[in-house]
Amino acid sequence: MNLTDEEIRIKVAEAMGWTNITAFHFEDVVTGKPKILHKGDCPTLEIEDQWLPNYPESLNACAEFEATLTDHDTMRMHHNITKILRQMKDPRPAWRSPAKVRCLAYLKTKGLIP
């Protein structure tokens, strides 16, 4: 399953409890390329009408969902990171995995993607 960064961002946000997610399309002032950002509410974090974290590109944002995992899920996620890195033929250890890989492993650990 190949998900875009936007799809990953929304799936992770929904798994974290974000609701009322709305997309905003605009042109990046620096690059001139089209860009999409999302706003939403997150009752579990007591957040209303805020920009969603950029989970696929930010290790700091990944720390939010990693902090919610049980010890068992943390071990499962580590295993899933290793599997994803091997599929990508990426030799780095799991603890150095990029944010996008962590997001995919989180979604897999939560049973939200195969």
Protein language model features and the residues they cover:
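Glycine-rich anion-binding surface patch
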Residues: 1-114
